[in-house]
Amino acid sequence: MRFQKTTEYAIRVMVYLAERADERFSVNALHTALNIPYKYLGRLMNQLAQKGLVTVAQGKFGGYTVEKKSLASTYLYQIVDAVEGLEDYDRCILGFLKCSDEHPCALHHLWLGIRKQIKDMLYSTTLADLVQTEHKTNGES
């Protein structure tokens, strides 16, 4: 299982903004930095702003930002929910509508543990965690 493309883009944008918290970026600047299609990115940023995950300022010096104070309280599940919803993380991995503990599909019991790990990760990982991981990965302290 992997994130939908929109969710991948949303997480990339949010981490980029979180690393530069309190700075403003236009859609064009984000498009250039992250190589996300411009028109697609504009719609995505509007979704994130409507959900309160980014703030937007209009005008010549406007743009999108993530406030530093929100990094530790913005969770990965909120980003996923804002763009694709969380329903897929409760559905049958094979797409059966009536799959349950009482009527399991062939992968049901194997998928339960994996699904729990994914959901635990979504609900316990903050933007602050992702920024910290990104800095460690890039050799920064």
Question: What are these language model-derived features?
Answer:
Residues 28-35:
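A short alpha-helical element within helix-turn-helix/winged-helix DNA-binding domains
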Residues 44-49:
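Basic amphipathic alpha-helical segments that dock to polyanions
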Residues 39:
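Key DNA-contact positions within bacterial/archaeal DNA-binding proteins
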Residues 70-94:
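Conserved segment of winged-helix/HTH DNA-binding domains
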Residues 51-61, 65-67:
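Beta-hairpin "wing" of winged helix-turn-helix
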